[in-house]
Regions:
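Acidic (Asp/Glu)-rich catalytic clusters
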Residues: 7-8, 56-61, 79-89, 121-124
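Glycine-rich, proline-tolerant flexible connector loops at the mouths of alpha/beta enzymes
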Residues: 7-42, 133-145
Length: 245
């Protein structure tokens, strides 16, 4: 039900995480991948920290999946990258290692560079690697927010890799989260973000994506924007009209 709902809302990829206390994660991953592919045609991102669960999902997947994720730890790279190569999967690389998330952009880029080198050495094409520079919460680490955007931009321009980001983490613990999420999403897209992990049911965030694609010429003749919004009235306009009646 969630998969169908998110697909209808405009999601382009579905993240699949079945980890929970007491469950057989490998078996459940296989079961869920099969079930999802029977009801939606969207690509799936298999999200697990356990290589055995990832392989069970990869084994039954039809098409090209995304593995979420590896990080800068050598033992993780050694376990997961061969699976990605074996099954032809793209892979998300988290800019984190045993030291945790580094506050500065340069340290995160250095980890991303190590991940890129390991992926290429494992035979994974560069275009199949997505780097996640990791979003820190503005409520707790406000001074480090821009470091994520800077690291993302450097990964895009200097490392030449694709990028992915969990956008809504930015607003955790703060009121009116949509305002922060939408603004941060726009900042990240301008810095070179390729994939946003976000709620497709958030009309404000989806509107930001569609509008951004028009303004950056990614949506020629505004075709997709017009298809989505030609017959819609913005919520603020609808509310104003209702108050006048």
């Amino acid at each position: 039900e969630q998969a169908v709902s998110q697909a209808e809302a405009g999601a382009q990829i579905l993240d699949v995480n079945v980890g929970a206390p007491g469950v057989d994660e490998p078996a459940l991953m296989e079961q869920v991948v099969k079930a999802l592919q029977s009801v939606v045609s969207l690509p799936l991102q298999l999200d697990s920290s356990h290589a055995d669960a990832l392989e069970r999902g990869l084994r039954v997947y039809n098409g090209k999946p995304i593995v979420n994720s590896v990080n800068g730890e050598p033992e993780v790279l050694e376990k997961v990258l061969p699976l990605c190569k074996k099954y032809g999967a793209a892979v998300v690389g988290l800019a984190i290692d045993k030291k945790g998330i580094q506050p500065g952009a340069e340290d995160r880029v250095a980890i991303a560079r190590r991940i890129k080198e390991a992926a290429l050495a494992a035979g994974i094409p560069q275009e199949d690697l997505y780097i996640d520079c990791l979003t820190l919460t503005a409520s707790a680490q406000q001074k480090d927010v821009l470091a994520t955007v800077e690291a993302l931009h450097t990964c895009k321009t200097e490392l030449g890799v694709r990028t992915i980001l969990g956008v809504s983490n930015i607003s955790f613990g703060l009121p009116c989260r949509t305002y922060l999420n939408t603004t941060f999403l726009t900042m990240a897209m301008y810095a070179g973000l390729d994939l946003a992990i976000m709620n497709p049911s958030s009309e404000e965030m989806m509107a930001a994506v569609y509008a951004y694609n028009v303004l950056t010429n990614r949506d020629p003749q505004s075709t997709r924007y017009i298809e989505r919004y030609a017959n819609r009235v913005p919520a603020s306009t609808a509310l104003a009209q209702a108050n006048q009646n």
